[in-house]
Amino acid sequence: MRVLSKSLAAMVAAATLVGGGAFAVAGTAYAADNDAITVTPNPWYANSFDGWGTSLAWFANATGSLGEESAITTNLGDDASKAKAVEYGKQLREQFYQSIFGDEGLDLNMARYNVGGGNASDVAYGYPFMRQGAAVPGTWKDDATGSGTYGNGVTTKQADKDKLAAAFDPTDDNQYDFSKSAAQDWWIERGATGDNPDITDVEAFANSAPWFLTNSGYATGGRNSGSNNLANPEKFAQYMAKNVEHLESLGANVDTVEPFNESETSYWGTPGDMASKYTDESDDNTKLINNYWDKYYSDKDRSVTPYSNALKKPQEGMHVSNAQQQQTITALAEALKDNDDTIIAATDATNSADFVKSYNQYPQAIKDLIGQYNVHAYSDSNQMQSRDIAQADGKKLSMSEVDGSWQSGSYNPYGFDNALGMMSKISSNVTRLQSKDFTFWQVVEDLYNMQMGSNVNPAGENTNWGTVLIDFDCTVAGMDGKLYSERRVNNNGGTTDGLEPCTVIANAKYNGVKAITHFIHAGDKVIANNDEDNNMTATSDDGKTQTVIHRNSGTSDQTFVIDLSKYGEIADNAYGELYLTTETSAEDKNAGVDSATPEVFAKTSNVKQAEGSVMIDKAAKTATVTVPARSIASIQLTGVTGYAKDAAVETGDTYQLVGKQSGKAVADTTSGDSALSLANVASDAENAKKQTWTFTQIEQPTDSERPDLKAYVITNAEGKVLVSKDGTNALSNETVGAAKSDPAAKWILNTSDGSTYQLLNAATKTNLDVDNSGTTVGTKVGLWQSPSGTSPSANQTWTLRNVTPTSQKTVNVQTAVNEKAVLPVEVTLYYTWGEGKATVANWDTSKVDVAKEGAYEATATATDVYGNEFNVTATVYVGALTVSDPVSATVLAGTSASEAKAALEAAPVYLHVKASPAFEGDAAKVTWNFDGLDTKLADAKAGDNIAVTGTYQLDDATTIALKGAIYVTAATPENVADTASNLTVTNQQTEYSKGDQWKKLTDGDTSAEAWVTWNSAGDYSASPTATIDFGSECELSSVTITYGDKAPASAKAEYTTDGETWMQFGSDVKPAAGQTVTFKADKGTVNATKMRIVNTVNNDYMNATEIQAFVTPVQGAAKNIAAASGTNFSVNFQEGASASKAIDGDTTSKGWSTWASTASTVDPVATFTFDEAQTITEVKTFFYYDGRASWPKSQTLEYQDEAGEWHGVGTKDGWKIQAGDAGSGSDGITAADTPTVDFVLGTPVKAKAIRLTNTLQDTKVYINVAEIQVFAQDSTVLTPQPASDATLGDLRLDGETVEGFDPSKTDYTVDLPVDAEANPVLQAFATDNAAAVKVTGDAVENGKLGGKAAITVTSADESETKTYTVTFNAFTLASLKVIGPTKTEYAIGDKLDTAGLKVTAVYQSGDKTKEVPVALDDPQLAIGSFDSTTAGKKAITVSYRGVTATFNVTVKANAVAPGPEEQKPGNTNKPGATGNGNKNTVANTGSSVAAIAGAVALLAAAAGALFMLRKRA
């Protein structure tokens, strides 16, 4: 194929620049990859991060003495093996340390030192009276004999509690014995001291005060666990201060001291039984006590030693009342007044709800003494309220403790669910709390306790807490010179035979944590993103490295896209590195649980992937990676820096606040007691003024605890400051400068997605809030606290719309030659949030020449509703329209010809001036030829399309041909799943009032738990099933189910037509937690009367949040609307709240009952009213048998018409009723006699309401109704499904259809003209306007010559894809052939004579060569100059389109004159004269003139290239 005319692509490109870029064309958009997961970080919204920590309780106390001879309690070998065991312990301890704080381990950098309380000297304080390792010693000095430490013979025994409490002087060094804490101290000395310590932050905390400073006399809590157990806050505070002093004497700096631990709870109780109770030698508890007593506690008193027979033994802890908390904080501040480096932290509540409760009871003076807020995360609720408090007070918030197991079942260190769950817990909690850190409860757990079950004594918990694991009793030296667990040796008959020595073990959480801690470090900033549950995003301290940690918890690989649009710069050489953390290999798992060491986990931890695994697209502003199923990807980007302007809320900029829930703007219009209310988003200047707010940032000091806080003063258009006042919003006349130090005028921005915000008032710690979640204009905008859930409230969430325009929408205007161009008076401006209208008063068209075809620019100034003036341009195309795009419409099967015609006539017609942008045509000029359409439609079935031709009347003499298509499809499927009428489930949890929770499965909320199959007995069905009964046969197209955080092992969908034979629907799946699974027929739809989703679980429960079933609707089909939205159901009498059960979809269980202790004589009436009148076709009542004939004698149906009048439909009776009185029984009536009363209306009625009056039997027996169904004709307007056509309707080059184009032909080759400089403009249009067209390939790059283009067409329903290719064969200029001019010899001073010069361009394409003469006046031809001032051979260069060649001429020297001659007047300037009158002796070729002429010619050509504008489909 040949292009008949030379390509003018260069001029097309020039015209494109004039027009402002690419132009949208109908049918050229393409769908995004539905399988891609996208995260959008916002680097502007960043919070400083101090690092990763762990409490040292209890593992440090249990392991710090490893490697010391004194720690060995049993030696099974000799002295030599014992010495080896001591050395083994040292190595084990160091390996253990490195696994936690080493840079190849978890790389933690923070430690919480547990200041012990301890119990009395005669109380057995250790295992099994405490949890293993939990007996953290108090540092007060033991004096069991009363030797004088505390004076007056006071001992440290239980009986002297009160005396000791009185005698104890917490400031006296002599009353302390810090050797007792040596085991835990080892960890501090090893990690937190020296010049470059691993542990950079140390916090001292206590679980309990010393036993004698408690009310109960025990460090394990009160006898009443909910009562205050702190007896002396002042001495306890001083005790804490002294321990801080001790820690700092070791060389550590204690940053914070926290005197409480979950002290608000009632967790901490001392057992009521004493060890002396257990005397039965056959009792396992007695055996356990005796195993340890003689060896360790022979000097203790069983009668004062509490013992618990529970699996979990006691630990230190105390409930502290709020009043005692305040006294402790006050006393601690006094005790620390000389320590400038240590601040008080509080309250270490178990969750944010408890923290907020305690905080709200503190007076301001107490709050001022607290330097840091600490909170645990054992619940995610109320975390945003904790965050708000810390932000408003300008203090750091520490997430100071959490752990858990995300692995179901018993001990399984390899279970990767634990890694995935831990990653999500970290990312979501750090982001939501904006905490300075993430600190584990204890990142280590006692291996024995995690691993062992109930079949041994002592039993273990057999679960999966902790991250690193080690036995907490490695005190037995084996004959092999290794250490062993004392419990394991005891269980093994006192030998080590067959036992594994003490080893550092890990579980899968170890890798899940490392996937984050090895990439996000102290000093980095955690940044917001749109999916905090699955992504943690951060930027390095220097801003040069961007980190994204992403988990794929699904069962298939993900295409993971990082949206970089909110970053400021993407360097040309930007690159990314990908590290993957995956499940341990089957081979390593098969080695057994004792082989689950950190070294084994390292094999699949942070494995660096090949270069190029992260694909950065600078133009698209994306980074893309493939993340395998069930893995964690750690991605680091280099060369991506800063933040984009639209990612930030810039100081001095003006914004609209548009509500997420309401879609309306905040206006400074009073409503109630607030100065603010909702208003429709302004479309005029007057209203816009009331909705614009200027944000002025309050800069935070560099030494601030919250340097990254996004705090602002907000002013309205009049300059008034938005403030909180009396619990609501007001406008103040204070200055912005004054407002910056006014908490009431300080607004703090929070975001959960990096794009929408909540506005927190610092004074009230409440958010800008739409009253009662209203959405109507005038609704008050007040203040309210953040919600207790994990997501911000929609009525507190705002889009901040910067009202400064950024660019304009392209304006293209077409006019015929010599006709005045009509330019718009309104244009569209783009903003960071979207688009808005602006008015134009006058266009400058001085550069538009309507007398000549071409593309011209017009300019104007546009003014938007916010008062901004913005310079805009329009491109005016002068010339006639030449070609049209395909036109299509899609209609339902069965549509009449008139309706089909109307659909096509309503479709827009787009036309072009050759390759110009598209212009919508005038519908009045369109004529379609519908001959034979009636017949074609009658024969058409769903999936067919009908071709139609037409014309566009350009003028009286000219028409443009139109090609149209009418697609015939079935109706778009609708979701019919409804728990009120057709959906039922099995195995729903009934405990904790969750029996009806499954009914939320069709409420549209995919986030809230609905169907859950848990039960306390752990008796789980293998196949929890959800079934939908459609009531009649229908066309089923798809079914979806969204799972919660517990997905089944597998799931399948089935359907039936007869209720007995079930057939597979789609494929079996193995869903992941949180996944939405869609089941589809292999092709099209299936006929079904019922469908079901069958889930298989492996001895575990599952949960789901939403189910949908899509069927092809039938116009006017009857549908049960009894429980539908818009239907209101009421009864005149009911037992309790039973009426609602009459419309719950259950026709077999008891529902509405009118039983009463005193029989009612009122006839029961059920009424249904409808928000909109309904066409009723049937009303059906299912009565219920409860052992007697509890139903009416008759039932009457009435309806209310649209005018409000009631009409009777009929009365039904004739079923069996009682013969005697109401209490006489059923008179032989059985359940089989239960009536179902069915009113089928032969002629449907239009009703605003219906009512059923039940006439009581003569016995006045109550009635029981199982279900009432009300059927109405479905008023849903059916819409056709998208078509499945993926063919091209037209393929054009430079505005002309490609020669030989046929929709069925997919490959085209174009031989370009020899002298083409660029490819012609390629445009592709689908036959179906709703299909997506995407053009790719090097051939469509601007200025490209040759190459290949691929055109991918995706059908509107995305079921079909078709690819076309266009290959451009191009000749390239290889060389020039030059034949020199006729004149080859010149005298000095002569000019070049080009007569006879011939230049030939030599083009090549493969093995083909073509020669084309070049005219000497070609503006691209340049002929060089030569120096004619000296004699000799001269080379002259000829260049053409970047290729050069030379030819030679000779300059001869002037002949020597024989002697002086008389000079004749007037000849001094002739050539060859020796006089200096010839000032220009260098030959000029005119090349500079040619260059100027060439530039002028190009500009002129560009101006005339209206038909060559490049537009890519």
Curated annotation (Swiss-Prot):
Keyword Heme in annotation: no
Record keywords, A-Z: Carbohydrate metabolism, Cell membrane, Glycosidase, Hydrolase, Membrane, Repeat, Signal, Transmembrane, Transmembrane helix
Compartments, record wording: Cell membrane
Residue ranges of the TM segments: 1489-1509
Span list, region Disordered: 1456-1480
Recorded effect of pH on activity: Optimum pH is 4.5 with beta-1,6-Gal3 as substrate.
Temperature section of the record: Optimum temperature is 40 degrees Celsius with beta-1,6-Gal3 as substrate.
Coiled coil feature spans: none
Catalytic activity from the UniProt record: Hydrolysis of (1->6)-beta-D-galactosidic linkages in arabinogalactan proteins and (1->3):(1->6)-beta-galactans to yield (1->6)-beta-galactobiose as the final product
F5/8 type C domain span: 965-1112, 1116-1273
Secretion signal, residue range per the UniProt entry: 1-31
Ranges for domain Ricin B-type lectin: 666-801
Pfam families: Big_3, Big_4, Cadherin-like, F5_F8_type_C, RicinB_lectin_2
Gene Ontology CC terms, in alphabetical order: plasma membrane
Known EC number: 3.2.1.213
Membrane-related topology note: Single-pass membrane protein
GO molecular function, one term: hydrolase activity, hydrolyzing O-glycosyl compounds
Keyword Transmembrane helix: yes
InterPro entries, alphabetized: 6GAL/EXGAL, Big_4, Cadherin-like_b_sandwich, FA58C, Galactose-bd-like_sf, Glycoside_hydrolase_SF, Ig-like_bact, Ricin_B-like_lectins
Family label: Belongs to the glycosyl hydrolase 30 family.
Protein task: Involved in the type II arabinogalactan (AG) side chains degradation. Specifically releases the non-reducing terminal beta-1,6-galactobiose (beta-1,6-Gal2) from both dearabinosylated larch AG and polymeric beta-1,6-galactan chains by an exo-mode of action. Shows lower activity with larch AG, and very weak activity with dearabinosylated gum arabic, gum arabic and potato galactan. Can probably release beta-1,6-Gal2 from the internal side chains of type II AG.
Name the record gives this protein: Exo-beta-1,6-galactobiohydrolase
